Regions:
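The Walker A/P-loop phosphate-binding site
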Residues: 365-372
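Extended, folded cores of ATP/NTP-driven motor/assembly subunits in large transport
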Residues: 1-365
């Protein structure tokens, strides 16, 4: 627990070093596989473990972390909640022409990015490796093609599976149906670590042996991350915002509610919450952020996908009674919003602080052994 607190403090300090407009995108991939270990060991315990676990179904996980940046100008509005839809605003499409003079901005950001990379490397509990251009291209392909369970080595010779969307909002990539669930209401308390709530392992289907109860503390996203024994992706997007601009925007929204507080009591309650938030930012010098969190599901069978969607909804409720929204009309739009490098386009988010946003990151590498 002390190590988790240390990691949390280090990450908070690293994010404070980044300028406003920087976007941190953690993309976690989970997929099922079978355990195979052909290594011979003279250690009786290791040999027995390998024999017992061999050919059993397991859940694999790997994480990619992307850092993107903007031109640094404060000419955009501060986004405050998850209610906006990009279909009502100007189009956000990936890989459009970079803004003017981005080479100069890249030179400015180089020192920040180097410090961030060195800071992550210095955390003993982490092991990171910078992607080269080929690996980055492969990662983008694996996400768009939903082939993350078999990562591609050279995507330049590959074509993405055809995509189709019908009038009901159902989306298919190749032969796989896609579903996205976005976090819209945070739970009452955010914690660096929490003893996770878990459902019965039989409810998840499959042959992966999941623990019915866990006594050790895990990252807050465990119920929708390692706690779901089927293929899925979890995206966490943290955009560093300017604290002064954020407080000003929230203050303006608070003032706009003055006209309805007399006949609509919830407006007065919201004003009190907004004032308390702004006071906390000012008093403790917190770094503000715009945070988005979603889960991407894919399955060849639509009925199976619906069952998995229900299990993810349950997982959100286990995450401190958080609430999620099952995307329909915005499904395709949000899928493209989470392409590596395009995460700033994700509009299903909310304002909080980096101290709170870091709680959503997956910070552990977990190995759960069989009780036998």
């Amino acid at each position: 627990e002390s190590e988790a607190q240390y990691i949390h403090e280090r990450l908070e300090a690293l994010l404070k070093m980044l300028p406003a407009g920087t976007v941190i995108h953690q993309q976690n991939f989970y997929y099922t596989d079978r355990y195979h270990n052909t290594e011979y060991s003279t250690n009786a315990l290791i040999a027995e473990n390998n024999r017992h676990l061999n050919s059993k179904e397991i859940l694999n996980n790997y994480t990619n972390l992307y850092v993107t940046f903007t031109n640094g100008q404060r000419n955009g509005k501060i986004r405050k909640n998850a209610s906006g839809t990009s279909l009502m605003r100007k189009l956000h499409y990936p890989f459009k022409q970079p803004y003017k003079e981005y080479q100069e901005r890249l030179t400015e950001m180089e020192a920040f990015l180097m410090n961030f990379e060195n800071g992550l490397s210095s955390i003993q509990q982490f092991e990171i490796r910078k992607m080269d251009d080929t690996e980055l291209n492969n990662a983008i392909y694996d996400y768009i093609n939903l082939s993350y369970e078999t990562p591609e080595n050279d995507a330049t010779q590959k074509s993405v599976n055809p995509m189709a969307i019908n009038q009901n909002g159902t989306m298919k990539i190749g032969q796989q149906y896609v579903s996205i669930l976005s976090l819209t209401n945070e739970g009452e308390h955010l914690q660096e670590l929490a003893v996770p709530h878990t459902g019965k392992s039989k409810a998840y289907g499959g042959n992966i042996e999941m623990p019915d109860s866990i006594r050790s503390k895990c990252s807050m996203l465990y119920p929708v991350g390692l706690g779901l024994p089927f293929n899925h992706i979890v995206n966490i997007v943290i955009e560093i915002t300017d604290a002064d601009a954020t407080v000003t925007a929230i203050g303006a929204e608070k003032d706009a509610l003055n006209y309805i507080t007399n006949f609509y009591p919830p407006a007065a309650e919201k004003q009190r919450e907004q004032e308390a938030f702004c006071n906390e930012i000012t008093q403790f010098d917190y770094q503000t952020a715009y945070t988005a969190f979603n889960v991407v599901l894919n399955d060849h069978d639509r009925t199976s996908l619906m069952r998995k969607t229900a299990l993810v909804q349950q997982g959100f409720s286990f995450m401190n009674q958080s609430a999620c929204y099952v995307e329909n009309a915005e499904l395709c739009n949000l899928f493209f919003c989470n392409i590596p490098g395009n995460a700033r386009a994700n509009y299903r988010g909310f304002i909080n602080t980096t101290k709170q946003a870091i709680c959503y990151l997956q910070k552990e590498g977990m190995y759960l052994s069989d009780e036998k």
